[in-house]
Amino acid sequence: MQLKYLRTLLEGQEQIQRIAGLAWSPNQQRLAIATADRHILLYDDAGERRDKFSTKPANPANGKNSYVIRGLAFSPDSTKLAVGQSDSIVYVYKLGESWNDKKVICNKFPQASAVTALIWLTSGSIIAGLEDGKVRALHSKSNKSQSLYGGDSICISLAANTKGTGFLSGHNDGTIIRYFMTDEATEPLGRVVQHPVPPFALAWPQGGFCAGGCDQRIVFYDSMGRQLRTFDHSRTEGEREFTVAACSPNGQAVAFGSFDRIRIFAWSPRQGAWSESATKEVACLYTLSSLLWRRDGARLALGSVSGAVLLFESVLRRTVWQDKFELIFVAPSQLLVRSLTEPSQALTIESQLGLEIDDVRIMGRDNYLVARTEESLILCDLTRNLSSEVPWTASGHHERFYFENPTVCLIFNVGELSLVEYGENSILGSVRTEFVNPHVISVRLNERGNAKENKKLAFLLDAKTICVVDLISRMTSGQISHETKIDWLELSETAHKLLFRDKKLRLILVDNYTGKKQTLLSNISFVQWVPQSDVVVAQSNSNLAIWYNIDLPEHVTMQSVRGEAIEVLRENGRTVVRSQDGPSEHNYQLDEGLVEFGTAVNDSDFGRAVHFLESLGDKPAAKAMWHNLALIALEDGNLRVAQRCYAALGNVSKAYYLAGMIQQADEFEESSGSPGILCPEVRAKLALLGSDLRTAERIYLEQGDIESALKMYQQLGMWDEAVALAERRGYNRIAELKQQHMDYLLSSEQQEKAGQVLEEQGDLQQAMSLYMKANKPARAARLALKTPHILQDEQVMLQVTEGLVRSELYELAGDIAHRLSRPEAALALYRKGGAYARALEIGRVVAPQEVTALEEEWGDWLVSRKQLDASINHYIEAGATQKALEAAVGAKQWRKAVQIAKVLDEPELIQRYAVDLAKHLAFAGDLDGAEDMLVRANLHKDAIELLNRHGKWERAYLIGEKHLKAEQVRELFVQLAGTLEEQGKFRDAEKVLIAVNEPDLAIAMYKRRELYDSMIRLVERYHKDLLDSTHLHLARQLESRGKLKNAEMHFVASGDWKSAVHMYCSSGRWEDGYRVAKLKGTEGASQQVAYMWAKSMPTEGAVRLLSKLGLLDTAVGFACDSGQFEFAMELCKFAGKPTDEVHLKIAMSLEDEGKFEAAEAEFLKANKPREAILMYQHAGDWQAALNVAENHLPDAVGEVLIGQASAALETSNYKDYEALLLRAHRPDLIIEHYKQESLYEDALRIAEEHYPSALNDLRRLQAQLQRGQAQAQAGEDAASISRSYLQKAAEFAKKEQFRKAAECLMQIDSSNAEDASTLERALLRAAEICNQFLEGQDAQELAQSLGPRLLAIKQIGPAAQLYLAADMPKQAVDVFIKTEQWSKARRLAKEIDPDLQLLAYVEQQQKASLKHEGNIEQLADIDIVSALDLLAEHGEWQRCLEKAKGLNPALLQKYVAVYAAQLIREGNCTTALGLYLSYGAPPIEAHFNIYTRIALDCLALREEQTERGTTWRQLRDFLFRLLQSLKATPAQSQTKFAASMEQFLLIAHYYATRAACKEVQALQPVALRLSLALLRHTDLLPVDKGFYEAGMDLRQAGREAEAFVMLNHYLDVCEAIEEGSGQLVDHSDLASTDFPSSVPLPEDIHLKNDPSLHEEVREWVLAVSMDQQVDQQLPTDDRGLYESSLGPNDLPCMLSGFPVRGRQPVTFQGSSNQVNRDVWSKFSVALKMSPGSGIADIISFTEKWQGAANYVMH
């Protein structure tokens, strides 16, 4: 959070003028300030003062100064202002909506005591805290108030929550109480916490609350009152009590105010914790009295006790979106959006979930905003200020947003379409679809003002199917299938109708209620619903078609039109179709009346609709609208309007019928008083008019009028329903009714129906007769089959059969034949009638051999009936697989077709259908199956094209590589890449080229298109060694084009920031050059650029620049250091700086040149005379130094003279020495020197003349010297002294003054003792006195002095006893330690210290002593590890390892590793290798670096250092054992280290094999191959060694061209090593190899110890380079590669390193590695011919490593 000062609204005063309150209106337009003089100042949102008014006291008699303002709060609607006063009243002022409105008091709320705090909740209540501790709610609407609760002490603060539904009150005793004004609270009410101090600063942010006070601590609590975090500022210098707090509107920041300081605390949604984010100190602000955040969180206003009011901007960060919008983040979850192009109020966008907003984008023609958090998506309609936040999981930002619909946003992500309605915080609906074009999606949400919720979505399920979804119920309300692909659809505004257009440009209308689909018109180029109506406008060719009544689509109005219709506009009472004809536009106005008719009908305004239709007269469109209005009126029960409509239509019968209904309704209304439409007879007739007979019947029966219901059915000729109703209701005249029914049937020649009735009544014979009479053989046959006795009548059955055959009812005829036991005839009839199921049943019994033919015949029959899907199984049963496949394909049963095709083996049989089947499989997502189908059909090119269309370039390449010629494949894919490139699909083109292993072409493509980022990405992946050079090349190219910014990026990426700086400086863009130097270069570099920049400018400008950069002094220093003193002087002059430093630098420069006089002048100009003096002193020119001192620095004259005197003393010139020091008034120095030299006579002479005060000291020193000499000549009687001490000690002991006695005895020492025994006796007596008579401090003090003396005379026991008696156990133990009596020391330590700490101390001291003495054997008995460490320190490694070997393996390996590390540091890698071969190499991770170093150092050895290959074999065996150990450890078997050891083992094996091959003449070519193969591993080998050895072997073999390339590269590498630049070596000559191009360079060249050989190689290369006959490049084979290089699928030969080629390579049982058969044969022959060579070892190790070889020698 950043606080930026904006402006001061009120200046602070010299005396206390406390700001009583601040209030910001919720609409952010007004800021109210309550001043100390009881006035209210009103400011607008720009901070300009707009109004002022005074408050009034509760009792005017008390005067205007009888109160102060205690609180201020705006109403939620921003029109009212509440003012709380100390005279126990709250006034509510109505301010109005504009500045000119009159201010009046609209509410008064007198209180029982003074108001101390005031807030106005957004829920509507004013909350006032009182001096008596009560908290009251004041209701402005009802002008009533109520007490909410009372506290035990004065209410000092109030804080509302962010929702405005609850508040906290802080009381003077530290109590904090929570209260909610609504019932939705989930947190407990009442006291939540007891704060340690009065909570004057109280706020309620999200997730809890916080408080601060006079203890200078800010405490954050959770919602239950538990402390979350405390910020203690009591130790902060200058910090005082916290007086006020304010919470930001979103609750994610809190501001606390104290003395001259504001502290901002912010909530981090990600960390879930509060932290102090900003502190703002404002001098002379004094204590803050008010603090308030604006509603949008972007402004913070504060008031102080001095009367100052300041305005700050509080933002986290701000950014500008495309120079159109400014995005201001005021909190992690809130931002403001302000338009930069149009003056408008900033919109607030906030995460309702409190999540941090990460990404913000303005989209949809700058009308919509999309913001993201970790768990949600925020969508905002900027034009209507509607926002929605919906849950949204992270999806990689792959969503696509569509804003074409003004009410809903469409979001497409991974095949799912989600709809979000603006202003709603939930997803309206989600559907699965792949078609997200806005033209094929239609959404209608509550349009046309429908009272009922109506939200519908129409979209494409597939290209030919439309789905309509009810978004409220989330159910599918309709699904429309079409035979052609659909390219446009749209619902009507009420969603009752759906229009869509297909690819054949046909316009189809669908009724969503009935599902009826109807084609309206063809060749449609434009179609649109007219806004706010159900009118449709479409263009077909040059005609405009208008459907004013879409319910009657056959009634269409046609109108010619010019150009192409582009839109339909409806505004200002006109509906216009706009068309575009070239550059001109045309407008065609529709009949607004007809359009308005639809609106009137929709609004049920029938009168307006009838009036309009009557005005139309006989227009064709009127008829359709009369009809439509009639139907709507009937549905609404408006009979008169319906009658009028039918009369207008000329439908006399319906008009007459309705007239009767109207009459009946009127009569019913007159008689009953109820609406006529409720008349049962009217309702029944209305149902009958709508053909709803069941409803009419129900209405009659509800009234008990069954006769009317029967009559209705009889009139309609529905006798069956009448009879059924009579039977159901138990009608008493049912027999008569049935007879009437039969008479009616016979009279109307309905014999069949009469037969059915007789059959139901059981009169079968008569029914049979009627069926035959009516020529209904099928009815007769079915009756006969159910009636056995009729079957017995052959004559009747013959007539029935003949009738059936004539009617071609062969199946029924077959049934009769089958029942009459004529199976052959039945089979023939069934086959003729297509009843193959029945035919098969009979055929399996009668003719089993024809079953297969019947199945195939059945299949053919079904195919002829177009029932292809049903025929498939029958063809399969018949074994006609080809026909089954044709039928499955024809029926589009792709799954079955694929299964059948898999059964067919011949490609020719499935080629005809393979392409179609593959397309289906690909569409279904089974790309593998599609590929297999085409490959099986030998349609390889089709398979490649299919895979390419789906982006599977690698698989397509594999098919082409396998089945097509290589050149053909490459040409095919490169051509495809070119096509993709032309289409702008560069990433797809790249994938294709990568698939065919042509990254260089992809790089070239990006270079052509100037897509340098992608180009660099590929270079980094495939040519990492050329990355820096590519960056440099692009940078130079961009620089030449003037694209300096882009060039800078590439210069910096290549690490050549200096070139970027030079580029900018050369082009005069110094500021950019300085920026790059400062960001990427060193500090000195940026300063140097700034200096050069300044040099390029006039001096005045240079001074301003350097001052701005803070580099003026640095630039002056640069100028002086470079000798440009004039420029430095000019800088100082223009900057107003003293030039002393410049003069000083000039003087020092002149001094270095020996120009002392000129230097002196400059030193003096620099006011540095002392430096001039020092210069002359260093030069030995004492007179010049003295002159300068006398003239310019008199205080230094003495120093010069002293220096000159010192120089005279060095030459023993005592005369000048004395004269100069006396001239300097320093005789004391002369005397001190003579004293040191013991020249007291000379010293006395000088003192007498010049320093009389020193005479006494000199004479005393001289006398002491003389006495010392006399004492040396005469000695004293020591015996008398010692006896006197003994006598005095005895006297003190008698007087029991034991300490004095002991001290007296201790006065006897070796200087005054009579003999040694006297001294010993005296000290022992003193010790005895201490032990017996002294204790405490006396004993300890004497023991500290006496103990060492006893120890000195070897009295060890008494000394220890003395320390023990004085309670000094450690010193007692130290006695035995110092005398190395270790057993006594241990015994004593055990006795006196049960905790054994002293015993550990003794053992530690003994170890240290033994280590110091080097007593290893004895030390080993005590501490074997210390003994081993000592051996290691002394370099006795064999003894160390032998001792460790006998202990445990882990200890042994520790010292083996230490010894090996030492050997490696000493450069003795072979000994270290032998060490691990002797003692083993455990798979311990701590040793891995040692193993790697041994391998690298050994591989760097010259061939002459390996003892004819012994080292290679040892290294190989060591690595093999190590790998075996690693594989035995599961945790290490697959690690990176194991993989690197595999590589080292392979290299060591190659070296050992090469060494063995060089011993055998026949294997010399194999040795050469190995030298070349080893170059593949120069990322591990020293690169110069590898190329040197390969080049020399090639040269020896006579292959000079290849040798030249190798040795030339060797010289290039050596040159790079010697220069130490780290630059990559040119690898272009080795492009056809698989040698790594980016390899580490060794520190020294391989031949550093043999420079003559190195020079020989250089001379040979030089000579060959001049030879024109040598090709000087590497040859390539048929693969286009160098012979040793491995292709993508090649394996290296385990004995030669070359690719395994040829037939039947030698394989191994233990691995997948191989050996070329000819190489193995050579080794086998060499083993027999040279049994003493190392070939046997090579073959043995190879089989040991890889397993037994599968090789039989022929």
UniProtKB/Swiss-Prot annotation:
Subcellular location field: Cell projection, Cilium
Entry keyword annotation includes Repeat: yes
Alphabetized UniProt keyword annotations: Cell projection, Cilium, Developmental protein, Repeat, TPR repeat, WD repeat
TPR repeats: 623-656, 690-723, 748-781, 807-840, 852-885, 1041-1074, 1140-1166, 1167-1199, 1211-1250, 1282-1315, 1698-1733
WD repeats (start-end): 14-53, 64-103, 110-149, 151-190, 194-232, 283-322, 519-557
SMART domains tied to this protein: WD40 (SM00320)
Disulfide bond residue pairs: none
Gene Ontology, cellular component aspect: axoneme; ciliary basal body; cilium; intraciliary transport particle; intraciliary transport particle B; non-motile cilium
GO biological process terms, semicolon-separated: cilium assembly; intraciliary transport; non-motile cilium assembly
InterPro entries registered for this protein in UniProt: TPR_IF140/IFT172/WDR19, TPR_IFT80_172_dom, WD40/YVTN_repeat-like_dom_sf, WD40_repeat_dom_sf, WD40_rpt
Keyword Repeat: yes
PANTHER family named among the record's database cross-references: IFT140/172-RELATED (PTHR15722), INTRAFLAGELLAR TRANSPORT PROTEIN 172 HOMOLOG (PTHR15722:SF2)
Role according to the record: Required for the maintenance and formation of cilia.
Family that this chain belongs to: Belongs to the IFT172 family.
Protein name: Intraflagellar transport protein 172 homolog
Organism: Drosophila melanogaster
Designated gene of the protein: Oseg2
